């Protein structure tokens, strides 16, 4: 936390530290501020923690900006140390589910849930919050670099009706939020880095593709079947290429088993794009009637190289799993949009700390995943608590005051 150089007052810094630390230590199913403060010895009233989010004069950007600079500097230092110059930038959004009865929290609304929807005819909507994340990977090191909360345009208009002009929110599309985060990244990335930006078909807009190419970055992403390559839609190309041989590409699945995919390669320009791209048509077997389409702007790469790079998007899904399941991202109980942003900022500070410990763990600790880091952090807290309690009991020659100090008693 000290390495972030947060520009907060001492009370603000203490509340951020308490909440972030308790988020990691807590094993509660729902990590509310009250439950987190019950873990802290001689903690102030939980309302102080809530007030630090609701009315304390700091913003989410006061945490986001230091995390961006810290993670960027750490990766640049590692690049010079390991002589690793290929940076993979993953972009994705995630939906944090809230109870259906949650109505009066400004950041909570119904969003289209593409993981539960069954095509356009059977859409599914989930009540919750949506955030967009940018993740960086350089060699064996990786960080959640930046994030943004997303609100639908209708929700922004509704909230602005009750706000003073200087407090009104501005609606931004998901692709616009993504472009803003990538623009900030461009200022931190050294010129010698070779950058690949990875995202799914939801972000494969022409504006985002053009933006990445203007920075000199390459893009590897999924495409929807209705995009036009040359004079045909992508959905028409499999039939047109039915006499062309498949290339067999082997990929390692999450369970480390090798799986073979049948791939055909195309080159051309998409509608309203001036640069040539490579498009892969992939299917798991000959009988599959719904192939997947992938785009790559680096024409020097083969299909066997492109698809493993696209697989590097998977860890961002793991990040989203940890912030939601283990760090309580969707467990906030604050009403205003700004307070919710602060909660998200504290959660991502906790995630950055865990990722830093994972990246810098000594070899003898055998730390291989964020779960190992969380387990180690909880063990260190438990050991410190036990040692302190034993030392105080020995000093006082009485265990009753020690129990009164270290055990929580509900009133």
What are these regions (language model features)?
Residues 160-281, 366-373, 403:
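An internal, acidic/charged active-site-proximal segment
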Residues 332-387:
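Basic, amphipathic alpha-helical segments enriched in Lys/Arg and hydrophobic/aromatic residues
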Residues 36, 85-99, 134, 196-204, ...:
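Short, conserved catalytic/metal-binding motifs centered on acidic residues
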Residues 1-59:
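Gly/serine-rich nucleotide phosphate-binding loop at the start of the catalytic core
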Residues 64-76, 85-88, 190, 386-411:
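Long, charge-rich low-complexity segments
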Residues 47-51, 56, 114-192, 273-293:
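Electropositive, glycine- and tryptophan-enriched low-complexity nucleic-acid-binding patches
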Residues 95, 243, 302-334:
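Short amphipathic alpha-helical "interface-anchor" segments enriched in bulky aromatics
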Residues 23, 56-154, 260, 264:
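Active-site-proximal, Lys/Arg-enriched surface segment
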């Amino acid at each position: 936390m000290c390495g972030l150089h947060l520009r907060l007052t001492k009370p603000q810094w203490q509340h951020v530290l308490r909440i972030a630390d308790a988020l990691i230590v807590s094993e509660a199913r729902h990590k509310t501020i009250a439950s987190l403060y019950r873990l802290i010895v001689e903690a102030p009233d939980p309302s102080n923690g809530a007030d630090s989010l609701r009315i304390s004069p700091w913003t989410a950007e006061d945490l986001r900006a230091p995390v961006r600079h810290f993670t960027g500097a750490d990766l640049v230092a590692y690049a010079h140390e390991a002589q690793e110059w290929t940076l993979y930038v993953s972009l994705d959004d995630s939906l944090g589910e809230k109870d259906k009865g949650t109505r009066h929290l400004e950041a909570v609304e119904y969003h289209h849930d593409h993981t539960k929807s069954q095509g356009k005819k059977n859409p599914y909507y989930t009540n919750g919050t949506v955030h967009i994340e940018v993740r960086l990977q350089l060699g064996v090191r990786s960080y959640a670099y930046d994030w943004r909360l997303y609100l639908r345009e209708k929700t922004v208009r509704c909230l602005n009706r009750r706000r003073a002009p200087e407090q009104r929110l501005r609606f931004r599309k998901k692709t616009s939020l993504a472009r803003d985060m990538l623009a900030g990244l461009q200022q931190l990335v050294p010129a010698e880095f070779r950058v690949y930006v990875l995202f799914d078909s939801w972000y494969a807009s022409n504006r985002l593709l053009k933006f990445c190419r203007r920075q000199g970055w390459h893009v590897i992403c999924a495409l929807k079947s209705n995009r036009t390559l040359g004079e045909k839609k992508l959905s028409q190309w499999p039939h047109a290429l039915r006499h062309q041989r498949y290339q067999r590409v082997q990929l390692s699945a999450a369970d480390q088993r090798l799986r073979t995919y049948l791939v055909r390669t195309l080159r051309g320009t998409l509608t309203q794009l001036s640069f040539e791209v490579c498009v892969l048509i992939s299917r798991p077997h000959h009988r599959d009637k719904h192939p997947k389409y992938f785009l790559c702007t680096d024409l020097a790469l083969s299909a066997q190289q492109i698809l493993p790079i696209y697989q590097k998007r998977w860890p961002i899904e793991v990040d989203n799993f940890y912030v939601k399941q283990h760090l309580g991202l969707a467990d906030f109980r604050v009403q205003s949009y700004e307070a919710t942003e602060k909660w998200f900022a504290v959660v991502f500070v906790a995630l950055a700390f865990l990722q830093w410990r994972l990246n810098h763990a000594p070899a003898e600790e055998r730390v291989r995943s964020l779960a190992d880091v969380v387990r180690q952090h909880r063990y260190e807290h438990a050991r410190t608590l036990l040692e302190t309690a034993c030392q105080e009991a020995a000093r006082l020659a009485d265990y009753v005051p020690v129990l009164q100090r270290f055990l929580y008693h509900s009133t």
